[in-house]
From Swiss-Prot:
Chain segments annotated as coiled-coil in the UniProt record: 1133-1190
Lineage: Eukaryota, Metazoa, Chordata, Craniata, Vertebrata
UniProt source species: Homo sapiens (Human)
A Pfam entry, by short name: KIND
Protein's name according to its UniProt entry: Kinase non-catalytic C-lobe domain-containing protein 1
Polar residues composition bias: residue spans: 1005-1019
Positions with biased composition (Low complexity): 739-748, 766-779, 980-990
Annotated function: RAS-Guanine nucleotide exchange factor (GEF) that controls the negative regulation of neuronal dendrite growth by mediating a signaling pathway linking RAS and MAP2. May be involved in cellular senescence.
Length: 1749
């Protein structure tokens, strides 16, 4: 080890326990919020608590600081916690005024609510903080050993009685005594050293405008850092592969390389280079290319606890550089953290990340990649290595002596190569250390883009740019203060990234928000201003100055709003995104595709190396030779969770292939030095294509898991634009794109090639791997291990991260780490809509043109984005997706686009093909419509064009020319692979996950049911589509045995349809793990199977793109790369943490609220407003995470969906014939009737909608794919009582289970397994959602189900045990009478974090303030006494019913002194409103949507008295015809709700008419009107309408108090009437705007029942006996809002005493006759003056008259 020189030693001694190896020049200035490092940060980074000496020092410094802030404002608002106790830049203790990180109140003194903040209170908090810091991360068995003095001090500081705590002076004296030999300042400064540098690095990595020059380091001459054990294989250079093969740069002569090689800095001052690999840092969960580009800053910032490696215990401030190999020096931290976020972090799987050393070489992503032979680089980038060079990520490599400096990837997404430095004995000439020039840039600035375009952006391009910029802005944690055309970069896939502003510091004030000129804080709206300026400049580019900018009004208005001078007047980024998104959505455009098309259209690549081009639609391929043999397989490195160590594992390194074999297999031209840089043209050989049987055979072998040397004689060419690799015999030959274009992320990869008429074939897997497991793709040097999952290319870009469906190791542009044997499959990605298409007239490739590279499981469309499932069980041809443009195997779409271009391409219209593409896709989506509807849809959509009838006929024939296969052909096709090159309708294409939402309106999503429907015959002509609907019959057609023989098992030959990309992934996840039905995690493992109300209301749009993106992000964080299940630990942990954050924030908010009431301080008010916003934000995050959890649960159920063509099996599967089923209403022929129309014109489209069905058919449809996802199951559970009883439904489900139970366990992949599993899911969803309304009131139902589960299911399938638990919990909950807020999801969980969030909100508010509320106040005397009426309190007893139960029920409350209506005046409007709301909410939470159905049969009528008297309700309901089946016993809870509403209305009227003075009546009228106003403003429409009903009583309206009521108060009555009209106007008026998701709501039960009665009017059945599902679906949507409103409870603090009194008063007047009560009160009449009183007045007048005389 080289010793330190004296100067360095002195430096370290002076600096304390600083980083051991490097001393940096002054770090950049930190933002204000990061100048302080908190104690929590330090503890997290050290991963251990404070030592005793440190505790004494911190205690002393805190005490001194506390004394200095005694008169500051922070003294009153401070709560000392590990988060608020911080150290400033000088190491001094300071306090931060931020939200207390106190989940359990451990740091809050017990007397806080009484005394507020005092010295004693702060001493308590300080003691608790020090105690927690000392015990931080202590082993459970190892208690921290503290001295007796420190223990005693901390104990006294935390004494319950403030008087027992030591005073500040005594604490200071004791601490100074203990620190006589040590400086407390020095200890604190040393303590904060690690956090100081980390935060500085964090801030620096996040600040894009910091120049590189300020990031210089001065390495110490020696290395004194910690070392690995000598035998540690992870650090031993001998076990590392020694790459050989590629020639060194110097041997080739000087030339410009497409990549910027990573060259070491010149040797300075005797510094030596190390040959060790780059140190790794443990990063947070895996991040992808899409996230890195879209959210570079936030993703690049290291987080506190989970981010940093555990530092050595003997050196708390140990360096963050942990060596992987033994050497003499380590890399400086500055080389690990790049100033620019785009090149900062190379995230790895399992959180392991490596960074490229970059002394003076910046790793900009604009550099052109060098493509290589035999290795797939990340994101299309590679180093100059031979095929045998190990390129696996996480594998340090050293340079060969003759190789020269090793090259490093030039993009943050390239994690394939480790940073390398020359060995000590290899000195590189100074000239060789200069950077090589980049041949092209992957990112293009807007300035360059506009310059090369030579024109301003068009309208739709501006909209797309605006949306992309705003999305990029919204995802950044720190908002850019300055944007210009040079700082906005556009990637090849259309992503937008903001780069730092110009280094020269020149700024154009035009792009700077006005408030920033005043040096205010950079806000989001300041950045919105910058975006508007950029867009304005782009729109006016090359337009003469004297010309007015001509923009459409809508766009111009948006830009002007975004550029308003006043920041508050500008729209937020979210609001502007909504406007832009709606514009593009209406036109079926994708912003990323538009920008990608622009980017591709101007991209001129200056290719320095000559390339090998493939003729006829193949991409240009660039290859490099390797003359040296490959080394033997070396141990690979696997990341170990959160530890920075690397563990060597035996076996070949993933992504490494035998090179010698490969070299002998390649043509000589590929390896010849003479021809390496000469173009080689390979003529396309039609014989390369394989026929279907061969593909099928290879597929079956592939499923076996091993493919050894199959087809070695064939050369497979991979023409993916971003896959520069040539694999072993059947590995693909990569190509960078036309003219050596830069590799593009998947999804934009066909842009350049297709723009030149050359669509790209898909990528191909390496030969030594099962092709189903992995696929060579851009940035995928890591093939997956053998697995049955398919490798699925995916659209990639910043706006859309890689979906978790991408197979492990396959198509991962970011190559986030070495794959392991544990990689699970991923769900299929969405097919991207590429902006490029083939040129008009270009003929698509036929089947014979398929290269060998397109293996068996390749899609028929020859496009990289096409999913390539290796397991043919996942390849059901009925699965649909949107059509992809530019496909070679989609002639219908190409021909339609060609016809459009020929007809309308004139005067520059349709010049770039984008408009024609969009129009073609839209028209292609209309293929299943009748000709008349087809013509009308086109003419209406594109009304600005003249559509000739002949053109429409041609288009109709083109799009309908290839009909869907019949069921028989579908079965045959299902057993084949999707590699067939025959044209196929979009019904055979995979659905998109994102098209489950509301995106991409022009992408038609044809029905997955179409290929299986009886009408879809292969030879049917277009006239067959003229029918408006079709019918699917479920009559018994064959025996079960015959059914099984003829119809392939759905689990084996089919893939779930209709948006089933996630379903498929979950299915593959289970299969890849070898989980059969007996071992498969049942629905219990997923906690819930109920789709929820939002499924019934929003149907397919329930889960938006944000949910899908989050699930994808979550999937990438899985250790095996698999889609997370519903019990994802990451999701559960995040949800738990968000709930805890909400709880502690709410507690803190409540404390501040109480403090504000006492002190009325302005500081507290400011804090309250901030906290309120944070609470709303936290609540929305929790709701979002809950929605994600629900999505995963729904996708579990979707694993078992069947195609409609297999639904007859469900009906005929029972051992007994269908007609023997004793379903009284179900013995007619069962069928389903669909409409042949488009369902979602604005998003995913569906050619067939279920219109009607017989009861048995509707129940069978529960088993169809997407039934859960599209809301059918939830809608069925709400409405099935109209056509069958719970007994019938249970019989149906149990019969399916009984018939499939045995067979499902015999064959885990069969259709029977799906039926069995889906039956359990539906049964669980029913029990979870409708237990209270169906099971208790239907005798024998519960017992039958329990007996069946115990006797039939549990012996064979133990996973069904949870169903019994649900039934038991349901009975317990019913007995307890708990409201819906505590649902059945987690019945036995007692933890707070497992409680439903809304119940948490409610209980937290109850616990928060009610326990600490002030003592009960006696009523204030306000002069309103009743002297004349005290003797006769009430003479109206005859008019009131006697509530005999009151005294027994309420106890002392009923005996309190009667103050009558006067008591109401003692309470504020808010108090009364909140308690009335809580009372109403308590009743509403117990109701169920089913309670509102069939209300007419209960006697609910549309009249003032909505509910009949109790005595007559039975007779009325008996007379009314019930819409339910006769033997269904209906729950009458709705009557209880309406009766309570009537009681409240009666109480309101009675309180007013029983008032004995007009003044009291005016007071009460005003009080009730203001309460009602508060109610409807807070969306408590139930109480508002009840009060309105009481005030509209005739006796109340005749009261003279109305005449003297203030005008402003009287106006409230008119507002209430307007609200009533609004509520009556529409049944879904309260669900508009989605604001209700964030606001509690209580609907008027009577008005909601009336709306449902209106929907129930009319017939439910058709002439053939089928029930109208469209009618039932509408009813289900309306009643679903009951559950929607129950999910958002009010969080007012309950006042039990006031509630008790209100209940008492309401019960007292229940059923009273208001007219009788009014007649007894003189205040209700106009008083006539008595004769005596009149005489007195006359006398006074007479005396006054005498005075004037």
């Amino acid at each position: 080890m080289q010793a330190m020189d004296p100067a360095a030693a002195d430096l370290y001694e002076e600096d304390g326990k600083d980083l051991d190896f490097y001393d940096f020049e002054p770090l950049p200035t930190l933002p204000e919020d990061e100048e302080n490092v908190s104690l929590a940060d330090i503890l997290s980074l050290r991963d251990r608590g404070l030592s005793e000496q440190e505790a004494w020092a911190v205690c002393l410094e805190c005490s001194l600081s506390m004394r200095s802030v005694a008169h500051a404002a922070i003294f009153q608002s401070l709560c000392i916690t590990p988060d608020t106790l911080a150290f400033n830049t000088s190491g001094n203790v300071c306090f931060m005024e931020q939200l207390s990180d106190d989940p359990e109140g451990a740091f809050v003194p017990p007397e806080f609510d009484v005394t507020g903040n005092t010295f004693e209170a702060h001493i308590y908090s300080l003691g608790a903080t020090l105690k927690a810091a000392l015990e931080y991360v202590a082993e459970p068995t190892l208690e921290p050993r503290l001295s007796q003095d420190l223990e005693a001090l901390l104990s006294r500081m935390q004494a319950e009685d403030p008087g027992d705590r030591p005073d500040l002076e005594s604490i200071i004296a004791l601490c100074e005594e203990k620190l006589q030999l040590t400086s407390s300042c020095r200890v604190c400064r040393s303590l904060s050293a690690v956090g100081r540098r980390v935060l500085s690095i964090e801030s620096f990595g996040a600040l894009q405008d910091v120049s590189e020059s300020s990031w210089r380091e001065r390495p110490a001459p020696g290395n004194a850092g910690p070392r690995r054990p000598p035998g540690d294989p992870s650090t031993d250079p001998e076990v590392l592969p020694t790459p050989e093969g590629p020639e060194s740069e110097t041997s080739r002569g000087p030339r410009a390389s497409p990549t910027k090689a990573l060259l070491s800095t010149p040797v300075r001052n005797g510094e030596s280079h190390s040959r060790e690999g780059l140190a790794g840092l443990v990063l947070d969960a895996e991040r992808t290319l899409g996230e890195l580009d879209r959210d570079a800053l936030r993703r690049s910032r290291l987080r506190k606890v989970q981010t940093f490696p555990r530092l050595l215990s003997d050196s708390p401030e140990a360096t963050l550089c942990l060596p992987l190999t033994r050497g003499k020096s380590q890399l400086p931290i500055s080389e690990l953290f790049s100033p620019d976020p785009r090149k900062a972090f190379l995230d790895r799987k399992n959180g392991l990340s490596s960074f490229q050393a970059q002394p003076k070489c910046r790793l900009w992503p604009e550099q052109e990649p060098e493509h290589q032979l035999g290795r797939v680089p990340c994101a299309g980038r590679s180093t100059d290595r031979g095929p045998g060079v190990p390129g696996s990520p996480g594998q340090p490599e050293t340079s060969h002596p003759s190789q020269g400096p090793a090259e490093a990837p030039a993009d943050p997404r390239d994690a394939s190569g480790e940073a390398q430095t020359p060995r000590d004995d290899e000195r590189i000439p100074e000239g060789a250390r200069q950077l090589e020039s980049a041949a092209a840039e992957q990112w293009v600035s807007l300035q360059d883009l506009l310059s090369q375009l030579g024109r301003p952006f068009r309208e739709y391009e501006l909209w797309a740019l605006c949306l992309a910029c705003l999305r990029a802005l919204q995802t950044r944690p720190e908002h850019p203060a300055y944007l210009c055309l040079d700082s906005v970069l556009v990637a090849e896939d259309g992503a937008v990234l903001f780069q730092p502003p110009p280094a020269n510091g020149s700024y154009d004030s035009f792009f700077l928000a006005p408030e920033l000129a005043e040096e205010r804080l950079v806000t989001e709206k300041a950045s919105v201003y910058c975006v508007a300026a950029v867009l304005w400049t782009a729109a006016k580019f090359s337009v003469p100055r004297n010309h007015k900018l001509a923009l459409p009004r809508r766009l111009k208005t948006l830009l002007l709003d975004m550029a308003r001078r006043s920041a508050p007047e500008r729209p937020s980024a979210a609001e502007a995104i909504k406007v832009c998104g709606s514009y593009l959505l209406q036109r079926g455009m994708d912003s990323r595709k538009i920008l990608a098309h622009l980017r591709a259209s101007i991209c001129q690549v200056y290719q320095e190396e000559e390339t090998i081009s493939l003729q006829n639609a193949f991409s240009v391929v660039e290859l490099k030779p390797s003359v040296a043999p490959a080394p033997e397989p070396s141990p690979g490195f696997l990341p170990v969770n959160s530890d920075t160590g690397l563990v060597a594992v035996p076996g070949p390194v993933p992504g490494q292939h035998p090179c010698g074999e490969e070299a002998t297999q390649l043509p000589a031209a590929f390896t010849s030095e003479a021809t390496h840089f000469k173009p080689i043209v390979l003529a396309q050989n039609a014989s390369v294509a394989r026929d279907q049987p061969a593909l099928a055979q290879e597929e079956s072998e592939e499923r076996g898991g091993q493919r050894e040397g199959e087809g070695e004689e064939k050369l497979s060419l991979e023409a993916h634009a971003g896959s520069p690799s040539l694999k072993t015999p059947d590995g693909p030959v990569p190509g960078p794109g036309p003219q050596g274009a830069a590799p593009e992320p998947l999804g934009a990869s066909v842009q350049r090639d297709s723009a030149q008429g050359r669509p790209c074939p898909p990528p191909q897997a390496p030969a030594n791997q099962p092709e189903g497991a992995s696929s060579a793709a851009p940035g995928s040097p890591v093939p997956a291990p053998p697995t049955k999952a398919s490798a699925l290319p995916v659209e990639q870009g910043p706006a859309e991260p890689i979906p978790p469906g991408v197979a492990s190791g396959g198509l991962r542009p970011d190559a986030l780490g070495p794959t392991t044997a544990h990689h699970g499959p991923r769900h299929p990605p969405k097919p991207p809509r590429s902006k490029a298409t083939e040129r008009p007239g270009q003929e698509p490739e036929g089947p014979g043109a398929t290269p060998a590279g397109e293996r068996d499981d390749q899609s028929p469309d020859s496009v990289p984005e096409r999913p390539r499932p290796a397991d043919r069980r996942l390849c059901l041809p009925c699965v649909d997706a949107s059509p992809l443009p530019g496909r070679t195997a989609c002639p219908s779409l190409q021909e339609a686009t060609r016809l459009i271009q020929e007809e309308f391409a004139f005067d520059g219209y349709l010049d770039n093909g984008l408009e024609a593409l969009i129009m073609g896709e839209y028209i292609f989506a209309l293929k299943d419509l009748t000709f008349a509807t087809f013509c009308g849809a086109i003419s209406e959509k594109f009304c600005d064009l003249y559509w000739d009838e002949k053109l429409l006929q041609n288009l109709f024939k083109v799009v309908n020319g290839q009909a869907s296969p019949s069921p028989s052909t579908a079965e045959e096709a299902g057993s084949q692979l999707e590699g067939s090159q025959s044209p196929r309708s979009p019904s055979s294409k995979r659905p998109s996950l994102h098209r489950l939402g509301k995106e991409k309106p022009a992408m038609a999503r044809t029905s997955s049911r179409a290929p299986c429907s009886p009408t879809s015959v292969s030879d049917v002509d277009s006239d067959a589509l003229s029918r408006g609907n079709f019918e699917v019959g479920f009559r018994p057609q064959r025996s079960v045995k015959a059914e099984r023989a003829q119809q392939p098992e759905a689990g084996e030959d089919r893939r779930p349809a209709g948006g089933a990309s996630d379903v498929e992934a979950v299915t593959r996840l289970a299969r890849s793990k070898g989980v059969g039905p007996a071992l498969s995690p049942g629905p219990a493992g997923f906690q819930s199977c109920s789709p929820g109300w939002c499924s019934a209301f929003y149907e397919a749009d329930c889960f938006g793109a944000d949910v899908h993106n989050y699930v994808k992000d979550l999937g990438r964080q899985q250790a095996d790369g698999a889609l997370p299940d519903a019990q994802s630990p990451e999701l559960e942990q995040q949800l738990m943490m968000e709930k805890r954050n909400y709880r502690k924030t709410l507690k803190f908010y409540q404390k501040l609220l109480q403090k504000e009431k006492r002190n009325k301080g302005s500081d507290v008010k400011t804090m309250l407003s901030k906290l309120k916003g944070q609470l709303e934000e936290m609540k929305s995050r929790v709701q979002f995470l809950s929605l994600v959890k629900k999505y995963l649960q729904v996708m579990y159920a979707e694993r078992w969906g069947l195609e409609p063509c297999t639904l007859p099996v469900i009906v005929n599967i029972a051992a007994a014939p269908c007609d023997t089923l004793d379903f009284s209403p179900l013995d007619e022929s069962s069928s389903l009737i669909f409409y042949n129309v488009n369902k979602h014109p604005g998003g995913r489209q569906k050619a067939r909608i279920l219109q009607a069905g017989t009861p048995l058919g509707l129940m069978a449809y529960l088993y169809s794919s997407d039934a859960f996802l599209e809301g059918y199951v939830q809608q069925f559970l709400y409405t099935f009582r109209y056509f069958c009883t719970p007994h019938d439904f249970l019989h149906f489900l149990l019969d399916r289970i009984n018939s499939t139970l045995t067979r499902a366990h015999q064959d885990p992949t069969s259709t029977f397994t799906k039926i069995y599993r889906r039956s359990l899911c539906v049964l669980q969803a029913w029990v979870e959602d409708c237990y209270a309304v169906d099971f208790p009131r239907n005798s024998g139902l519960l017992g039958k189900l329990e007996d069946f589960i115990s006797s039939k299911i549990l012996p064979l399938d133990g996973s069904a045990k949870h169903l019994l638990g649900l039934l038991e919990v349901g009975m317990d909950r019913r007995a307890e009478g708990n409201p819906r807020g505590t649902d059945l999801e987690n019945p036995r969980e007692a933890e707070e974090d497992a409680r439903p969030f809304n119940a948490l909100c409610k209980r937290l508010s109850e616990d928060g303030i009610s326990r600490k509320s002030f003592p009960w106040r006696l009523p204030r005397g306000n002069g309103l006494v009743l002297p004349p009426h005290k003797e006769r309190p009430y003479t109206i007893a005859a008019a009131l019913p006697k509530p005999c139960f009151l005294e027994d029920f309420y106890g002392p409350c009923a005996k309190t002194s009667e103050k009558g209506p006067y008591f109401l005046t003692e309470y504020s409007t808010h108090q009364l409103f909140s308690q009335l709301t809580l009372l109403q909410q308590e009743l509403f939470q117990k109701c169920h949507p089913v309670h509102f159905l069939n209300s007419r049969a209960l006697g609910v009528m549309d009249k003032s008295t909505a509910i009949p008297k109790a005595s007559s309700s039975e007779s009325l309901s008996a007379k009314t015809c019930s819409l339910f089946l006769p033997n269904y016993v209906q729950d009458k809870y709705l009557l209880q709700l309406l009766r309570n509403a009537d009681d409240v209305s009666t109480w309101v009227a009675a309180e007013i008419v029983t008032s004995h003075t007009s003044k009291l009546q005016v007071n009460l009228l005003s009080k009730f009107l203001l309460i009602a106003k508060s109610c409807y403003e807070q969306r408590n429409f139930a109480t508002a309408m009840q009060i309105l009903s009481g005030l509209e009583h005739l006796a109340v309206r005749q009261s003279p108090a109305w005449r003297i009521l203030p005008a402003k108060i009287a106006e409230v009555m008119e507002e209430l009437k307007a609200v009533e009209v609004f509520l009556k106007s529409d049944s879904l008026c309260l669900m508009e705007g989605r604001r209700f998701r964030a606001q509690p709501t209580l609907p008027s039960a009577h008005l909601l029942a009336m709306h449902i009665q209106q929907l129930e009017t009319g017939g439910f059945t058709m002439t053939n006996g089928a029930h109208r599902w469209s009618k039932l679906r509408n009813i289900a949507k309306v009643v679903s809002q009951v559950h929607a409103f129950q999910e958002n409870p009010y969080t007012f603090s309950p006042d039990p005493k006031l509630q008790s009194y209100l209940k008492q008063r309401i019960a007292r007047f229940s059923g009273a006759d208001i007219s009788t009560l009014a007649a007894d009160s003189r205040a209700n009449f106009h008083q006539v003056s008595s004769e005596k009183h009149s005489r007195k007045i006359q006398d006074k007048l007479r005396r006054m008259k005498a005075t004037f005389q």
